[in-house]
């Protein structure tokens, strides 16, 4: 499933095509994705200008001139592509061969600037839902989410406070969207490696007995930010279905330090350890037992 860097990459790709433009056409080619699409979705979208395109955790949010917000999630295999030019009725189109299977093009936005934005989702785990202003705070998918790891409010003190007293592993705590929003298996493994912390370590060890952040918490926050920034710069990680809106692959997977590198040498300077894999809470965890403590 796409994690924060992949969703942020998609947001940045959609922004030039959608932000500031009016939705002149909306086509839902089936009645459902993961969930049934709202019957009035087209009525509430057509004619509205996209005032801004934001992201919360792994969700995209299009702010409309009506005050409504369109909530979008990529699911397991969802991707957007932006068509300009010939494919949208004007010169200069581009697309990627991967997107030629139009059978999975389930939703199409036609924008006033000539862009055509297509949502393709073979597995149909993605979803779209329009929310009125008063519904946003109580939306189940958004309610209770923790801080954004790239936001100003996320720091060692906040992370230590969220982990204080927890008897779960550090990895399990970081995957809890109530602790920090948007992280998934890949970037938790990579961040823990960057901070030289074991995924098996108790989450509570990020805080002192008085609840103050330890040096481990400081290192971990720094590592989380660093790996997310690097992944976004690389266009995310393309392991299965992720594509940028241009159709290009992300390439951060070529920079993985531990994820999917079982049996390979540790990349930490001065460490002669080997990357190991074990199953933790039903997911594969990759780490170097020698330098992650």
UniProtKB/Swiss-Prot annotation:
Task: Tell me how the cofactor is bound.
Answer: Binds 1 zinc ion per subunit.
- So where does DNA get bound? 104, 123, 166
Q: Tell me the superkingdom of the source.
A: Bacteria
- UniProt zinc finger (FPG-type) residues: 257-293
Which residues are named in the active-site annotation? 2 (schiff-base intermediate with dna), 3 (proton donor), 58 (proton donor), 283 (proton donor)
User: Is DNA repair a UniProt keyword of this protein?
Assistant: yes
Which keywords has UniProt assigned to this entry? DNA damage, DNA repair, DNA-binding, Glycosidase, Hydrolase, Lyase, Metal-binding, Multifunctional enzyme, Zinc, Zinc-finger
> Which cofactors does it use?
Zn(2+)
Cited PROSITE patterns: FPG_CAT, ZF_FPG_2
For this protein, the record's Gene3D superfamilies field holds: 1.10.8.50, MutM-like, N-terminal
Gene Ontology MF: a single term: class I DNA-(apurinic or apyrimidinic site) endonuclease activity
> Which terms under GO biological process does the entry name?
base-excision repair
Q: EC no.?
A: 3.2.2.23, 4.2.99.18
Q: Which reaction does it catalyse?
A: Hydrolysis of DNA containing ring-opened 7-methylguanine residues, releasing 2,6-diamino-4-hydroxy-5-(N-methyl)formamidopyrimidine; 2'-deoxyribonucleotide-(2'-deoxyribose 5'-phosphate)-2'-deoxyribonucleotide-DNA = a 3'-end 2'-deoxyribonucleotide-(2,3-dehydro-2,3-deoxyribose 5'-phosphate)-DNA + a 5'-end 5'-phospho-2'-deoxyribonucleoside-DNA + H(+)
Give the function comment from the record. Answer: Involved in base excision repair of DNA damaged by oxidation or by mutagenic agents. Acts as a DNA glycosylase that recognizes and removes damaged bases. Has a preference for oxidized purines, such as 7,8-dihydro-8-oxoguanine (8-oxoG). Has AP (apurinic/apyrimidinic) lyase activity and introduces nicks in the DNA strand. Cleaves the DNA backbone by beta-delta elimination to generate a single-strand break at the site of the removed base with both 3'- and 5'-phosphates.
> Which NCBIfam families does this UniProt record tie to the protein?
fpg, PRK01103.1
Query: Which family does this protein fall into?
Result: Belongs to the FPG family.
Indicate the quaternary assembly.
Monomer.
Name by which UniProt lists this protein? Formamidopyrimidine-DNA glycosylase
Which gene is transcribed and translated to give this protein? mutM
């Amino acid at each position: 499933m796409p994690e924060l860097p992949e969703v942020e990459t998609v947001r940045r790709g959609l922004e030039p095509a959608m932000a500031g433009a009016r939705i002149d056409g909306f086509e839902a080619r089936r009645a459902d994705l993961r969930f049934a699409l709202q019957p009035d979705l087209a009525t509430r979208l057509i004619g509205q200008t996209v005032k801004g395109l934001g992201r919360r955790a792994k969700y995209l949010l299009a702010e409309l001139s009506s005050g409504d917000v369109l909530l979008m999630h990529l699911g397991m295999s969802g991707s957007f592509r932006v068509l300009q030019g010939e494919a949208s009725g004007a010169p200069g189109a581009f697309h990627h061969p991967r997107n030629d299977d139009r059978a999975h093009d389930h939703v199409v936005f036609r924008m006033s600037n000539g862009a055509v934005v297509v949502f393709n989702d073979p597995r149909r785990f993605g979803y779209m839902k329009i929310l009125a202003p008063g519904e946003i705070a109580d939306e189940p998918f958004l309610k209770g989410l923790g801080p954004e790891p790239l936001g100003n409010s996320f720091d060692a003190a906040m992370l230590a406070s969220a982990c204080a007293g927890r008897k779960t592993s550090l990895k399990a705590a970081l995957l809890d969207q109530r602790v920090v929003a948007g992280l998934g298996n890949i970037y938790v493994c990579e961040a823990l490696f960057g901070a030289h912390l074991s995924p098996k370590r108790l989450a509570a060890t990020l805080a002192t007995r008085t609840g103050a952040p330890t040096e481990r918490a400081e290192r971990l926050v720094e590592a989380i930010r660093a790996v997310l920034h690097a992944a976004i710069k690389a266009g995310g990680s393309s392991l299965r279905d992720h594509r940028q809106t241009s159709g290009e692959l992300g390439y951060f997977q070529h920079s993985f330090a531990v994820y999917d590198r079982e049996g390979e040498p540790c990349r930490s300077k001065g460490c002669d350890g080997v990357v190991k894999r074990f199953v933790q809470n039903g997911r594969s965890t990759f780490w170097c037992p020698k330098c992650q403590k």
